[in-house]
Amino acid sequence: MKTTIKSTILAILSLVFIVCLVSCNTAEKTGVWENATYLNDAEFGNGAKTVVVEVKAEEETVTFTIKTDKDTVGAALIEHGLIEGEEGQYGLYVKVVNGIRADYDLDKRYWAFYVDGEYAMKGIELTEIDEGAKYRLEYAKE
């Protein structure tokens, strides 16, 4: 009888611990992050090159570490469904990053692309991967 009670109490405490652990590790989707695919840092792929891309929107940031065999930052992100866009006269116009849409026509928002803290001089699909570089996509407003 005592063993059954101890086992039941242990099972209940274990369940409570698991629920607390899961709920503490879950970020809440709010604002522009409501449609985000990832709310926490994530790793993708298993290629020879490593590219690290920070995604910043409002006050929140996630970092994606991608191992890829692709040659450009854009191709690595597209390979894992992390960006979407439309081809335009100047190359790929990124409209969605991590599930977050920036619609310039609607609210003058766009995705700015930075390399080592400087606004990129080339589009994301033309920027070759430099494993030592710091890349950032930032939800910006004109």
Predicted regions and their residues:
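Ubiquitin-like/PB1-type beta-grasp interaction modules and other compact soluble beta-rich domains
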Residues: 2-13, 19-142
